[in-house]
């Protein structure tokens, strides 16, 4: 076998592989003999038909099979001998097999880029430092109370935090528009559900009031026909309600699985959950900054094939996230939607992979156990979850990969420029939610 390697453009390589005629002819004869023994030929016993007839009947089939086998086996040998790492399946272009002649084919494919991660010491990370304060705990308890609140009708002017029930008809230049009309519409004032100015116009109004709301749709509004348009909403307020928060009674506490009904036990459980959520958010913040710095310090070419594979994976995840689709009912989500995210994933994967290989990072079992225990605390029976992971090798390997990634992040962090900044619990959690 002879091999020549050509760089066509960027990461694309073209191998021209030549297989000696003797090797090809022997493979064709073997294939023809096999076909002669298994195929029925009128007038001849199995395996007794003349070679000329066998070639005439099965020659094309034999050549196709041999060409396929030769391309697959010799391509693998060629990339091993030339130390090439394909980033995707090759495009094969074979010449026709001719008896007594060498068989030549080309294989075109992309390779992974060759690079060494550098610039770790230039990465800047602002490490947020936060704790769950009593005020944060109190706010969370209030949130739980609001989630179980009831509403009571009042004879009062609408104010922030109150719920109103109203009818309205929207128009632009005197003409009603689709989606601009509602009856019995419920709205909690201050929730920010409506376009700017809508809720403000309701403040101070009482049940029975009829009024007009003048607003302008934002320039980036989702409906193309409404962007930047001035509109009027002829409105009537039907009902004003105030929120009634439940007291921290034994009955209320039991709703959250605290069988004793003890308020302090509820607070302890909520604090534990908040601390777990905070720890994850702090970790995510640092990790995101490390990866951003790693990418900025190492600009590398990306194989188009690897990016395309990642786009397909992201597209499938999106379809599953939105409920899944059967057969041909799935919408065609354009690649452009996922291009940036896919490129980042591939780039981060390549860079982190190099850090892991270069530093020979292996999963630390203590770290693996710590990750499992942390995940288990979110379940009712942590012990059962831990045992499940320990008995499931596939799940365990997934956690080991997470541990290796965490260890790589820690290594980069040890070389980076790190400063600490005290921040509030809400700030960390809100940033984490926005990034998700």
From Swiss-Prot:
Its main location: cytoplasm. InterPro entries: PPIase_dom_sf, PPIase_FKBP_dom, Trig_fac, Trigger_fac_C, Trigger_fac_C_sf, Trigger_fac_ribosome-bd_bac, Trigger_fac_ribosome-bd_sf, Trigger_fact/SurA_dom_sf. It is found in: Cytoplasm. GO terms for biological process: 'de novo' cotranslational protein folding; cell division; chaperone-mediated protein folding; protein transport; protein unfolding. It catalyses: [protein]-peptidylproline (omega=180) = [protein]-peptidylproline (omega=0). Belongs to the FKBP-type PPIase family. Tig subfamily. The gene is tig. GO terms for cellular component: cytoplasm. This is Trigger factor. Residues 161-246 form the PPIase FKBP-type domain. Its EC number is 5.2.1.8. HAMAP family: Trigger_factor_Tig. The keyword Cell cycle applies. The keyword Phosphoprotein does not apply. SUPFAM superfamilies: FKBP-like, Triger factor/SurA peptide-binding domain-like, Trigger factor ribosome-binding domain. Keywords: Cell cycle, Cell division, Chaperone, Cytoplasm, Isomerase, Rotamase. Pfam families: FKBP_C, Trigger_C, Trigger_N. Consists of 3 domains; the N-terminus binds the ribosome, the middle domain has PPIase activity, while the C-terminus has intrinsic chaperone activity on its own. Involved in protein export. Acts as a chaperone by maintaining the newly synthesized protein in an open conformation. Functions as a peptidyl-prolyl cis-trans isomerase.
């Amino acid at each position: 076998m002879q091999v020549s390697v050509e760089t066509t453009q960027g990461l694309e390589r073209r191998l021209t592989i030549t297989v000696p005629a003797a090797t090809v002819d022997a493979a064709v004869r073997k294939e023809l003999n096999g076909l002669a023994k298994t195929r029925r030929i009128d007038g001849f016993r199995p395996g007794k038909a003349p070679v000329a007839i066998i070639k005439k009947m099965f020659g094309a089939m034999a050549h196709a099979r041999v060409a396929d086998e030769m391309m697959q086996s010799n391509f693998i040998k060629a990339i091993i001998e030339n130390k090439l790492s394909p980033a995707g399946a090759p495009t094969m272009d074979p010449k026709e097999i001719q008896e007594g002649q060498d068989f030549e084919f080309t294989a075109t494919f992309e390779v992974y880029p060759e690079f060494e991660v550098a610039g770790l010491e230039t990465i800047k990370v602002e490490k947020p430092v936060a704790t769950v304060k009593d005020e944060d705990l109190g706010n969370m308890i209030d949130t739980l109370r609001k989630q179980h609140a009831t509403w009571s009708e009042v004879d009062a002017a609408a104010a922030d935090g109150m719920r109103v029930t109203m009818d309205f008809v929207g128009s632009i230049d005197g003409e009603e528009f689709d989606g601009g009309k509602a009856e019995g519409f419920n709205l909690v004032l201050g929730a920010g559900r409506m376009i700017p100015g809508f809720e403000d116009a309701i403040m101070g109004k009482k049940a029975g009031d009829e009024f007009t709301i003048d607003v302008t749709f934002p320039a980036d509004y989702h409906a193309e026909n409404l962007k930047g348009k001035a509109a009027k909403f002829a409105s009537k307020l039907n009902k004003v309600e105030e929120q009634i928060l439940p007291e921290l009674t034994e009955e209320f506490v039991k709703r959250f699985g605290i069988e004793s009904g003890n308020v302090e036990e509820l607070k302890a459980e909520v604090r534990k959950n908040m601390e777990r959520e905070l720890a994850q958010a702090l970790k995510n913040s640092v990790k995101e900054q490390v990866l951003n710095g790693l990418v900025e310090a190492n600009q590398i070419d990306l194989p188009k094939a690897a990016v395309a594979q990642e786009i397909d994976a992201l597209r499938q995840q999106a379809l599953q996230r939105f409920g899944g689709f059967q057969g041909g009912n799935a919408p065609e989500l354009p690649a452009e939607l996922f291009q940036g995210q896919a490129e980042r994933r591939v780039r981060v994967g390549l860079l982190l992979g190099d850090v892991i290989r270069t530093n020979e990072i292996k999963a630390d079992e203590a770290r693996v156990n710590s990750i499992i225990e942390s995940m288990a605390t979110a379940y009712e029976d942590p012990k059962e979850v831990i045992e499940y992971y320990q008995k499931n090798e596939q799940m365990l390997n997934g956690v080991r990969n997470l541990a290796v990634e965490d260890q790589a992040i820690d290594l980069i962090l040890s070389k980076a420029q790190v400063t600490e900044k005290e921040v509030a619990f809400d700030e960390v959690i809100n940033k984490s939610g926005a990034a998700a």
